[in-house]
Amino acid sequence: MRTYITNLNGHSITSTAQIAQNMVTDIAVSLGFRELGIHSYPIDTDSPEEMSKRLDGICSGLRKNDIVIFQTPTWNTTTFDEKLFHKLKIFGVKIVIFIHDVVPLMFDGNFYLMDRTIAYYNEADVLIAPSQAMVDKLQSYGLTVKKILVQGMWDHPTNITLQAVNHKKLVHFPGNPERFNFIKNWRIPTELHVYTDHNMQLPTTVVKEPYQSDEQLIMKMSEGGYGLVWMDDRDKQYQSLYCPYKLGAYIAAGIPVIIQKGIANQDIIEKNNLGFIIEKIDDISNIVESTTEEEYMEIVSDVRRFNPLVRQGYFTRKLLTDAVFSALNSM
């Protein structure tokens, strides 16, 4: 028996979807998994025969009873995901579907894909879901997979040495103002430092920082401030279901987080004293201004006690190992 994992390539280097899949794959390879590379491309350029040959090439090294971690979606359309899944089935392998996102739940216009998505999920031997809330939601649409693991948190592997921290009364947010409208509507006195290459007019208390490499970003954020996890109103329901990737970056940087109430990771933040949970964006200034130096440093200490789990990839290591055990276990 050998273990494999699919991996997305061909997106922009800033693509969170690709960064997340590449990160999981790097950890998997360190555990002895082999990579099944999947390139992003317009699938309509393939004839049915060409598509079949392409999928044969991806799967050519597989043997019966191998285990494949299938990271979904591939972002090559649901049709591609279905075809790849069923090609894997032909090879007689055990399939663990690792859900990063559920396209029908992300965008209202794609909800028509829900039945098809659930149908191929239900053929998996094991399912990894971002949260229990996501499991419950998918079960309400017909999910019947018995073996389910919950991810809980994105890792953010890094060897960057953390800087001495100061209680800076500012908030960090790596993100595109075109994607997150709350940035353009920022009306509170606390400075929001946005890391982006997009040029546009922003409110006076929004400080535009240049896009930075992961190492530069972690080092800069580790000097102090708060990491913000926030979604626009239209995305709040989905935020309660999935794991935001940037949360792991803040934890890796060793700074307190400010998150929106209802986020899927809320219990981890609360139980480990990693930051603050708020209901409305106006609450940010009150937290930043009222938190004392002593209180801030206490939370920083708790974050930096916890963050080796994220910085060294232990959430993903455990998840992948548990997935193999679950795939082979008869119960």
Swiss-Prot record:
This protein's pathway: Protein modification; protein glycosylation
Residues that hold UDP according to the record: T16, R179, Y211, Q212, S213, D214, Y242, C243, P244, Y245, K246
Gene Ontology molecular function: any one: nucleotide binding
SUPFAM superfamilies given in the database record: UDP-Glycosyltransferase/glycogen phosphorylase
A Gene Ontology biological process term: protein glycosylation
Changes seen on gene knockout: Altered modification (probably glycosylation) of Srr2.
Record keywords: Glycosyltransferase, Nucleotide-binding, Transferase
Residue segments, region Substrate protein-binding loop: 106-111
Record carries keyword DNA repair: no
Keyword rRNA-binding set for record: no
Superkingdom field: Bacteria
EC category name: transferase
EC number: 2.4.1.-
Domain notes: Dimerizes via the C-terminus; dimerization is required for tetramer formation. Binds protein substrate via an exposed loop in the N-terminus.
Family note: Belongs to the Gtf3 glucosyltransferase family.
The protein's assembly and partners: Homotetramer; a dimer of dimers.
Cited function: Required for polymorphic O-glycosylation of the serine-rich repeat protein Srr2. Catalyzes the second step in glycosylation of the serine-rich repeat protein in this bacteria. Transfers glucose from UDP-glucose to the terminal GlcNAc moiety of 3-O-(N-acetyl-alpha-D-glucosaminyl)-L-seryl-[protein] which results from the first glycosylation step of Srr2; does not use other sugar nucleotides as substrates. Complements deletion of the gtf3 gene from S.parasanguinis strain FW213.
Protein's name in the database: Glucosyltransferase 3
Source organism of this protein record: Streptococcus agalactiae serotype III (strain COH1)
